[in-house]
Amino acid sequence: MSSEKDIKSTCSKFSLSVVAAILASVSGLASCVDLHAGGQSVNELVYVGPQAVLLLDQIRDLFVGSKDSQAEGQYRLIVGDPSSFQEKDADTLPGKVEQSTLFSVTNPVVFQGVDQQDQVSSQGLICSFTSSNLDSPRDGESFLGIAFVGDSSKAGITLTDVKASLSGAALYSTEDLIFEKIKGGLEFASCSSLEQGGACAAQSILIHDCQGLQVKHCTTAVNAEGSSANDHLGFGGGAFFVTGSLSGEKSLYMPAGDMVVANCDGAISFEGNSANFANGGAIAASGKVLFVANDKKTSFIENRALSGGAIAASSDIAFQNCAELVFKGNCAIGTEDKGSLGGGAISSLGTVLLQGNHGITCDKNESASQGGAIFGKNCQISDNEGPVVFRDSTACLGGGAIAAQEIVSIQNNQAGISFEGGKASFGGGIACGSFSSAGGASVLGTIDISKNLGAISFSRTLCTTSDLGQMEYQGGGALFGENISLSENAGVLTFKDNIVKTFASNGKILGGGAILATGKVEITNNSEGISFTGNARAPQALPTQEEFPLFSKKEGRPLSSGYSGGGAILGREVAILHNAAVVFEQNRLQCSEEEATLLGCCGGGAVHGMDSTSIVGNSSVRFGNNYAMGQGVSGGALLSKTVQLAGNGSVDFSRNIASLGGGALQASEGNCELVDNGYVLFRDNRGRVYGGAISCLRGDVVISGNKGRVEFKDNIATRLYVEETVEKVEEVEPAPEQKDNNELSFLGRAEQSFITAANQALFASEDGDLSPESSISSEELAKRRECAGGAIFAKRVRIVDNQEAVVFSNNFSDIYGGAIFTGSLREEDKLDGQIPEVLISGNAGDVVFSGNSSKRDEHLPHTGGGAICTQNLTISQNTGNVLFYNNVACSGGAVRIEDHGNVLLEAFGGDIVFKGNSSFRAQGSDAIYFAGKESHITALNATEGHAIVFHDALVFENLEERKSAEVLLINSRENPGYTGSIRFLEAESKVPQCIHVQQGSLELLNGATLCSYGFKQDAGAKLVLAAGAKLKILDSGTPVQQGHAISKPEAEIESSSEPEGAHSLWIAKNAQTTVPMVDIHTISVDLASFSSSQQEGTVEAPQVIVPGGSYVRSGELNLELVNTTGTGYENHALLKNEAKVPLMSFVASGDEASAEISNLSVSDLQIHVVTPEIEEDTYGHMGDWSEAKIQDGTLVISWNPTGYRLDPQKAGALVFNALWEEGAVLSALKNARFAHNLTAQRMEFDYSTNVWGFAFGGFRTLSAENLVAIDGYKGAYGGASAGVDIQLMEDFVLGVSGAAFLGKMDSQKFDAEVSRKGVVGSVYTGFLAGSWFFKGQYSLGETQNDMKTRYGVLGESSASWTSRGVLADALVEYRSLVGPVRPTFYALHFNPYVEVSYASMKFPGFTEQGREARSFEDASLTNITIPLGMKFELAFIKGQFSEVNSLGISYAWEAYRKVEGGAVQLLEAGFDWEGAPMDLPRQELRVALENNTEWSSYFSTVLGLTAFCGGFTSTDSKLGYEANTGLRLIF
């Protein structure tokens, strides 16, 4: 380089205006004009002085001399015959040229095999030197350097196998180097230099408007190792080298250090070039490298260098508006420790810009440092029209495809974008930031992928930490940076099978199988689906101390605040907002034990948001088959401090697994919100300790405002699978070829182990026996206790204001809360001032807990909560029902309330029902279990028309009276609307509180027992007792539980004494006590409860049981015998015959046996008995009640039956009305045959045979005020009929047909229906004699009827029977031609007719099955009807086409009707009566429209529509429609 400074300047005139036009700007290069010399066209060459212009047609050979032997200003290229230079002195050589060189290229120029590397100071084959010490200013000079200008289509330059020891073996210029309009193409092959620029070296290079560029196998041997790539990335250049340092500063027409390739219309290829010890395997530039508006493919293939395997530049590198770009097999071989930056294909200290190109493919590029394909300060890929593909790129450090220091922007591309098969230590696809692997701080950058139109995919990228790499962060299988945004893209976004394999390091952030961001991850406003599938974060073995001293065991590795996880995404804040469908499927996370020790937070099989995760406003969200495995790993699908799922069209978390908490998701610090979504589903998720579906360790789970159904189904929290899985992983190290299969099967094995653990002890025998187990250690016992929340684990759970049903079904937990657990499993996890609570409020749909369970463990008896385990439970303000069905647990089949907890239930707009819940500890029925000594019930409230229903027992672990608790209020006066029912059925409930019924009713039904320490009833409130029910007052002085003596409270009931003349039953412990145990004024006894058809023997009276020795003061008691269901008098077993009904029994309990209260005390009571009135609408047994008497401590009343009043819904009208419907089907078929098969049109073809078929249907409604005594019905039927008829003689037709149909009848007043299916067979005939048309037919039908009748609380019955019907008809019609209509092929007929119809329908006797069963004797209905009518026909005939349209009006009169049989008996009541069908009007008015069209002599179609009503005077009692359509084939 130093020798160049000794060469003096050589210059020639070159138009400034032309160069300015060429080089004005990148965007202007496409419109450059021809180059000029001295103002003349290049076609008019002007030679000045010695000929320094290359005249290609005169070249015979080249004279090459030593650079050192040349005088100042002499040239390397000399034109002439070599013989003319022999034996001549140097001074005979062409003289000095005053200006630089301009070469006009007309024909191909080929230089080959010039080797000057043995000359120490050999320069390029064609050289231009400029002195750096010119006295005169150079600003005025037109052009400096070398320019080649093509002058024809053949103009081409080929430089092959040219070698030199200095820079630019083929072309060297200390100034500019320009190629213009070289239409024969440029080729540089196998050129090499021991310094920079294996082929060309210049201050700047422009290749413009040339026909292609081929650069192959050029090399530079210059050594840049050890120098900082940041100082001079543009040092090297296997083929081209451009730098501004060759001649110092000057006023440049093209910026120094730039290389521009523009507007070329041929292929551009750089292949096999190398700078093995420098940068830029093909091109190295100290300035910019620009490829602009080239029309054909530009490719860089298998180039290699330390940094920038193809291109290295200290400033920007841009490819704009080009055709297809291909970067394949390029390699940056320099390592970071040797100062190399990387960039397997491109490396830049400025911005790498790929814009407006027709396609980009980067394939199999590699870097031993960063950026397998591209490295730059910034990287922008935008506005490209064709696909952008990065495939199988590899980097040893960051960015398998792209590494940038500040920003990577991929925007506004028109076609698909794909990153596939990349590999790196971090950022397998893209890494953005300034990284340090030596323990220094890393500054991360931003990745923005937005507003692209095509699909975007990242697949099969891999991060494998083969060494420590950068220390602060590890991961990002596809993308790695500080802030990552994917927004407003129009195509599908796919992240598939991206994998991160890293080892743990103290205090770091590890993971993100697809994306790792230390700041925000924003995926927003994308128009098409987004899927993360098969991404993974898996551990690698830790490096040894010898390999990496940073892991010195002497320093220790304490727990840190590091984070690990995110099988798909790991970011500090993750926001997935307002997208189309979002899917996370089969993503997985595996963490080693070492990693769990080193890092403070591990988890998120799909997503780990270190601070927060928001998934809001997406059309649908699905997390399926994700898992997070390893010690202490939570969030099978999602882990974050706070989680928000809001405003999504649907949310689905299914089959996710975590080895610690949150099988689906975990919020580790704050709340988890499921708000304002559509359909929400959590199904088949598995967790080990905290929450099979959701874990929220320190916050609330809020399920609020969702517009669709919310379901938690088949989620499991169980421990036992983990030990098995870990052992398998540790014991067996699979072969490399088996690893992928093992990963795929891991999820299935883990799930099966969950199911096995969940089933192993769930089903115990009814007596509670389990197989004996060996004793276990306290440590193991403590470990077993830590499992809760089959669906949800949280501090508090709020289920509020949802619009559709919220369902928890078949969820399972080992220990606590089969569906929901709130609270803490460890003392150290409890938060001051935060009381565990479940709130269910304001929901419009039903809230259902069904089939949930927690396992029985004999070593942990004080556990449970089949559906819910909490401290406080509040259910209020719901307009839907809240249902607890068939849940099971060790204790608290439905709900377990922990000590100091309370329950507040309000049936507001729906019922609250506990049914079928059971527990092992209660040995059966168990609705709510109250643990400890302080848990209690605050209030049970129900609004009018609604109820709280306990089919199962309320169970208290400790029956010591709750002295500190308030009285249990039933329907508190705080709300006047609390007038509903609190209902206990079947089970025995012991409530260690005093009960105060202030409004509404408390009902003990179906043998229920309710025990309490006191009972008070306010005026207006009801106490309803059914037969066998017991209201029991617990004895405060009697031990009721092992180790507990009960003491009497001092103030349970508000009244302290009984005022004189009070109207109530007032019972105290003894005569001296002024506080009552019982204060009741009215007892209502349910009449319907005393007996049923299944009961036998003596009826047990309702009981009021008080402690032995209790004192009854005088007072009045009203006892109402009530008909609560309105069907009390339908109690056949009780009221069918004379009976004594025990209304009430008063019993005193003692230590040994129950005894009656003293006769004296009972006789002092003034009991007023009121029996239910028999009103006009009271149905059932009629009779008289006697005066009530007390007999042996029991209040008894007698019944004397006098008769039975039949409920109209039992009259059986629907059975008899089915006879009418039987005839209706036969009549509809008859009318269709008369209208379509027996017509004058049919008679036109003598001796023809017709095969026909049609569909038919009808609808009838029969009801009227004057028919109210017998139930009306709505009937509908539909079917198909087919037949054949033949014309035996002229105008005589005989035919047969068959039909099948389905139908249904519904009662108009009652809940009864009949389903019908039947068949019909018919024969028919017609004879046309002049104007007279005779028609006749006979039909026989059979119908199978299936009836179901529902009687509400009385049950339902069903029956089946077969009915039959016969219909015979004869009709005579007179056809009168009114006259032809113009044109003459129209004809109009007026046809009056009369008909006689005989119908007979019957059914055999049958008996119903079920409750309120009836027996029907056989019955029949026979009638004769005479219809009269007229028909208007308009016929159109033209050739073989014939169409007849008709309008018929008829009036039918029923001349004869007879109903026979019909006796009905209500079997249980022993009551019979005569049934009958509706008394329909005997007139019927019909209007029919019909069309018969013969399209040819072979084919005909038919269509008919009929409407009818019940005559002129009763049109509202009978209304119906019939329709038919079909075709005829004529033979």
From Swiss-Prot:
Alphabetic keyword roster: Cell outer membrane, Cell wall, Membrane, Secreted, Signal, Transmembrane, Transmembrane beta strand
Record-annotated Autotransporter domain positions: 1244-1531
Gene3D superfamilies: Autotransporter beta-domain
Residues in the signal sequence: 1-20
Location relative to the cell: Secreted, Cell wall; Cell outer membrane
Topology within the bilayer: Peripheral membrane protein
Chief location category: secreted
A single GO cellular-component term on record: extracellular region
InterPro entries in the cross-refs: Autotransporte_beta, Autotransporte_beta_dom_sf, Polymorphic_membr_middle, POMP_repeat
Family: Belongs to the PMP outer membrane protein family.
Protein name in the entry: Probable outer membrane protein PmpD
Species of the source: Chlamydia trachomatis serovar D (strain ATCC VR-885 / DSM 19411 / UW-3/Cx)
